[in-house]
A protein has these predicted regions:
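Non-catalytic structural scaffold of enzyme domains
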Residues: 1-235
Length: 235
């Protein structure tokens, strides 16, 4: 570990999303032998409070407190740079609070911003795309997590006509991705597709799967010929 910079992953939001990000790192690393892989540390903390509940005022406990503890654990374990396996956790109210807690602890850990790297990745890989569909949680929409950054980049964000399909796909107690992620239920997959259809009908040229659990339901690279953006791949 001391010879190579270790990558930290803060997971647990839900747990499968962190595992998925770790798998992506392995899959995208070009190697010829085991020893060529990048040291990776996954800290999966299911005690991190729900991000959307906090953002919508249903909870007063900022998830950034628990997130900072997890990131500090990663740093103590040898991580020099870390990613957070949750889109909604990157809202300013949570992400900035997390960074402030790290600063108080005199941490030198570099924490990547998932939304920023995703927008940069879209501009680099799909330079002609201007109309960008966003699929995410209510917290992601309410706090314009992607909207503001896309608009700043000269892109037009598009949202589904209704958020209920995605909320059910993610949170349903029986068929939702959080309850049933391996494998994801066909009910959840179809609900995600219905939301994708809505932004495609508005003219989306690419669609962001803006919740780290959505790529678990839809691992395909395209849908009806439209590129699906998995932010974890840009992280």
């Amino acid at each position: 570990m001391s010879e190579q910079t270790a990558i930290g992953i803060l997971g647990g939001m839900g747990p499968q999303a962190g595992i998925d990000l770790a798998s992506k790192i392995v899959a995208q690393t070009k190697v010829k032998r085991d020893q060529d892989h990048i040291p990776t540390i996954l800290y999966s903390d299911p005690l991190i409070p729900d991000r959307t509940h906090f953002l919508l005022g249903d909870s007063t406990v900022n998830p950034g407190n628990e997130m900072a503890k997890g990131l500090l654990n990663l740093e103590r374990s040898g991580a020099k740079v870390a990613g957070i396996a949750c889109n909604t956790a990157h809202s300013a109210l949570i992400f900035d609070h997390t960074l402030s807690q790290l600063k108080k602890a005199h941490s030198s850990l570099e924490v990547l911003h998932l939304i920023d790297v995703t927008v940069e990745g879209i501009r680099a890989r799909h330079p002609s795309a201007k109309r960008i569909g966003i699929l995410g949680t209510k917290g992601t929409y309410h706090f314009r997590l992607y909207d503001d950054r896309l608009e700043a980049a000269g892109l037009l964000p598009l949202r589904p006509d209704t958020f209920e399909h995605l909320e059910e796909a993610i949170y349903h107690s029986d068929s939702g991705i959080k309850a049933c992620s391996s494998p994801v239920s066909d009910v959840a997959r179809q609900l995600v597709f219905r939301s994708a259809d809505q932004v495609i009908q508005q003219g989306a040229e690419v669609v962001i799967l803006g919740c780290t659990e959505l790529p678990l339901a839809v691992p395909e690279a395209t849908y009806k010929g439209i590129p699906l953006i998995d932010p974890g791949l840009f992280m």
